[in-house]
């Protein structure tokens, strides 16, 4: 979204500073911790949110986002959640806010070939605009496909990993 000139605010659980918050800062994005600021407080502090792209995997956040969304705003839900989380929500306030505020909520999955190509193009642009930044995302290298157990361990347990990747073949 920074590549498209948008102001970006990332809202996540972990308190900064840490690697992700620093990387976002390098792009000119703001990082806010849910441990320090509610989404509603962030909306008041930085102005109403025109677009919220929810990808946390924490379903209650979708309803908080619905309340924090500004007039004429769009809430995009992109995470598939499992489990049976239950929260109490003020459905009348959310409904009224969406109707009178002309808000939109949509769900999306970006799984087509065109989405993949668009993603690759954005990665190329990101490298041009922010040289070297993408390599900082590649935090955990796994050598060979036969080390899938190690890859899964990092994906599940390594809280410092941003992107775990498999080096399929050595160059040469």
Task: Go through the PLM ranges and name each one.
Residues 12, 79, 168:
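Short beta-strand/turn micro-motifs composed of small residues
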Residues 78-82, 108-110:
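Short strand-turn motif at the edge of the Rossmann-like AdoMet-binding core
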Residues 73-74, 104:
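Short glycine-centered segments of the SAM/dcSAM-binding site in methyltransferase folds
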Residues 22-25, 94-101, 125-135:
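Short, conserved catalytic or adaptor-binding loops enriched in Gly and charged residues
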Residues 63-66, 113-172:
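C-terminal hydrophobic helical "lid"/dimerization subdomain
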Residues 2-64:
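Adenosine-nucleotide cofactor-binding segment
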Residues 80-102, 120-121:
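Rossmann-fold NAD(P)-binding glycine/threonine-rich loop
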Residues 69-71:
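Helix-to-beta-strand junctions that scaffold the AdoMet/dcAdoMet cofactor pocket
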């Amino acid at each position: 979204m920074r590549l498209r000139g948008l102001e970006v605010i990332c809202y996540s659980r972990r308190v900064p500073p840490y690697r992700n918050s620093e990387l976002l800062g390098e792009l000119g994005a703001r990082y806010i911790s849910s441990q320090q600021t509610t989404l509603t407080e962030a909306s008041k502090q930085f102005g109403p949110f025109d677009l919220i792209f929810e990808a946390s995997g924490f379903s209650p956040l979708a309803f908080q986002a619905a309340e924090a969304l500004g007039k004429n705003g769009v809430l995009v839900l992109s995470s598939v959640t499992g489990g049976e989380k239950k929260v109490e929500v003020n459905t009348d306030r959310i409904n009224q806010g969406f109707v009178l505020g002309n808000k939109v909520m949509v769900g999306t999955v970006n799984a087509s070939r065109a989405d993949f190509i668009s993603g690759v193009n954005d990665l190329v642009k990101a490298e041009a605009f922010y040289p070297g930044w993408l390599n900082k995302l590649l935090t955990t290298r796994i050598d060979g496909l036969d080390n899938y157990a190690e890859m899964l361990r990092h994906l599940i347990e390594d809280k410092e990993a941003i992107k775990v990747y498999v080096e399929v073949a050595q160059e040469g």
